[in-house]
């Protein structure tokens, strides 16, 4: 599960992978105390996240092999990077159903689930708007993605 501290907004964002949601908390930077928990966005298996130069959260989704952009002001989300395949999508849907029932899904973590990427997409590195960004997997792959 990933998290991000947004000092400009005094917020802490937390990914809850098994609940398919991103939580937002008010954060008192001086004391570290949290309050006002809300669900910012519902996306499949959110993991690590970063804030881009436009103030949007970019969140890796391992089971969907996608990167989502989430607006912290209103929770609107859309996919900015997609490496999912049809077989991976079917297996992701099975895994999400199992999570909703409180069941495990480890046996679904097969090469088919990961799609075209070399492993489950778990992280990202982003710079300013004119730079490429990078996606990382659970293993050792780091893929450069041009914004052109």
Say what each PLM segment does.
Residues 20-22, 65-68, 141-143:
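Structural signal for beta-propeller blades
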């Amino acid at each position: 599960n990933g998290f991000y501290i947004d000092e400009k907004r005094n917020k802490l964002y937390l990914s809850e992978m098994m609940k398919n949601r991103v939580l937002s908390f008010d954060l008192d930077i001086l004391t570290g105390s949290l309050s006002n928990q809300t669900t910012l966005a519902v996306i499949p298996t959110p993991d690590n996240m970063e804030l881009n130069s436009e103030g949007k959260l970019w969140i890796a989704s391992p089971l969907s092999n996608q990167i989502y952009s989430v607006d912290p002001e209103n929770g609107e989300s859309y996919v900015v990077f997609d490496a999912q395949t049809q077989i991976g999508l079917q297996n992701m849907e099975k895994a999400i159903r199992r999570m909703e029932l409180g069941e495990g899904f480890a046996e679904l973590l097969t090469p088919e689930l990961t799609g075209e990427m070399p492993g489950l997409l778990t992280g990202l590195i982003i710079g300013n708007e004119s730079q490429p960004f990078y996606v990382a997997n659970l293993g050792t792959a780091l893929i450069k993605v041009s914004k052109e």
